[in-house]
């Protein structure tokens, strides 16, 4: 980081959500509830997958990593937003802002790659069921997840290093509730053409290419399903990928609306609302989508509750006996 960058600005001001002061308490309670639901729901998914041996399959291996990523992704922005709403302290230090940008990009890209890996898993399961065990081996799954982490880290690091080279002069007010990369580039008084090129390249790598892979996977899945002779087989195939398809639809609809619509149709308030859906709502909904539409998850939850009930009953008997 150059001395010019260090002396130009030491902190930024986050304006937060476009809400009136009298609405702060309501929105604070709402987002706190959403964040707790996100954390607890995804932790429950991870716990169920860990405890139930029937869920030790490639699909749930990817799902457990997606749950961890959703917790982390939401934790990058929501706690800071809640703290700002509660204390009205809107300042964030320069290094803290750069760090938040890094982790936001990292977990956003990781989410995209993991969802793509899950689509590939569903493609193999439905289109090549006889070879599923030999293709989706444990080492293959680990490689897909590890590759997702490495590529996401590289993309985030590229953006962060380029961002750290920019100078920020007089204006240090960010009209957002977190340190959004696009908002930071607008504040810079340096040439951001290299940053814009990096954003375009990363969008192809981390958004469009995974989305294309998902479309191709589901295209093959659709063709295979149409060739299944029995209605029961079709329903089973659809139930296998229904939850994942719902997550893909919510995730990429928000991404496309936020980053790929023409600027003229996107006001700042609309961008903030889309970001809220992207960072707070979607990670909260994922556990419900996978649990409500998944017999394996619901079965594992019933087992966990029955075990908990049995343990509680045994503890009560011991207490009474003592």
Curated annotation (Swiss-Prot):
Disulfide bonding pattern of the chain: 97-189
Extracellular side: 1-25, 80-100, 159-196, 260-272
Signal peptide: none
Membrane topology: Multi-pass membrane protein
Residues carrying a glycan: 5
Pfam families: 7tm_4
GO cellular component: plasma membrane
GO MF annotations, alphabetized: G protein-coupled receptor activity; olfactory receptor activity
Major location category of this protein: membrane
Keywords assigned: Cell membrane, Disulfide bond, G-protein coupled receptor, Glycoprotein, Membrane, Olfaction, Receptor, Sensory transduction, Transducer, Transmembrane, Transmembrane helix
InterPro entries per record: GPCR_Rhodpsn, GPCR_Rhodpsn_7TM, Olfact_rcpt
Membrane-spanning ranges: 26-49, 58-79, 101-120, 140-158, 197-219, 237-259, 273-292
CDD domains given in the database record: 7tmA_OR1E-like
Cytoplasmic topological segments: 50-57, 121-139, 220-236, 293-322
Domain of life where this protein originates: Eukaryota
Cited PANTHER family: OLFACTORY RECEPTOR (PTHR48001)
Function: Odorant receptor.
UniProt record similarity statement: Belongs to the G-protein coupled receptor 1 family.
The protein's name: Olfactory receptor 1J1
Species whose genome carries this gene: Homo sapiens (Human)
Gene name tied to this protein: OR1J1
